Amino acid sequence: MEKSGKSYADALKEAQQKGYAETNPTADVSGSDAEAKLLLLSAVGFGLQLQPGTTWRKGIGDIHAVDFRYAGRTGSSTIKHLAVAKRVGQAVEVFVSPALIARENFLAGIDGATNAICFKAKKSGGSRIERDCDYVLVGPGAGGGPTAVAVLGDVCELARGEGRFAGLPSLVPEGALKLQPAEEITGSFYVRFIVKDRAGIVGDIGQTFGHLAVNISEIWQLRHSAEELRALAESYSLKENPNEILPFVITLERATLRQVLEALDSIRHRDYIVVDPVWFPIWGTK
């Protein structure tokens, strides 16, 4: 989508043809497959025994080509689907979501069917790759070949009676850390709006966030050609005249997910909103 400008539907179809996504792509695009893997890593790294559906999970279905254009407006950022488990004091933030990520971040360069695991270890003595990353494991994560090799390897281990499937020991005693409630996860956020083109909208949105003590960091508004607006309207099956809609993005200073969602729940019902706002975290901000 980023490089070709393809719609989500066309990009998904191509991924299915290449074997990167299942015929039923729900687990791939909803983030549930990534969540399952993240829960295993959270158990090993933090001693958390979590069930699917107990964490904040956001898929990629809301992402459109226009979001990549805004992300790359200065060539400085892109969008990646991240699965994150991060210790904050005696709690652990666990979530799966698309995220705005700086181009200079190592994970921004992971493309196609390649997967990467980036982790930070206290007093690791390793070579720091990123501020939040001491070590990286990179390899193919989708497609017939990698999947077949992984499955065959598991079958061979079972046949030999090896005990890898008995479970991995946790690095942290079970129960020592707790799951951070999703609504208390804190960060900066990207929010993309498509509204009716009229005056006063940004002020109203800013006031709504302000009432919840959330500050707007930046407002991005690009020039869109008639062709871009028409394609955007078609992708959402909008009835509005494409020349009368206005996409724009705001970024928010650090806030809790509860604050952000409360504001958006109010804004989405305003008469100037054409489609529900699209939002996701900005990764790597302090």
Predicted regions and their residues:
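Short secondary-structure transition/capping segments
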Residues: S7-Y8, L12, I63, F68-T78, ...
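Substrate-binding/catalytic subdomain of NAD(P)-dependent oxidoreductase enzymes
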Residues: M1-E2, K6-G109, A113-A116, G143
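Residues in well-ordered beta-strands of folded domains
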Residues: W56, K80-A85, F95-A99, C118-K120, ...
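Catalytic, metal-anchored helix/loop core of enzyme active sites in primary metabolism
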Residues: E14, G19-T23, E93-K196, I201-Q207
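Intrinsically disordered, low-complexity coil segments
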Residues: G75-S77, K86-A91, K122-Y135, R223-L246
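A generic structural signal for short, solvent-exposed coil/turn residues
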Residues: R73, V88, D111, I129, ...
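A conserved regulatory-domain signal marking ACT and ACT-like small-molecule sensing domains
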Residues: A150, V155-K286
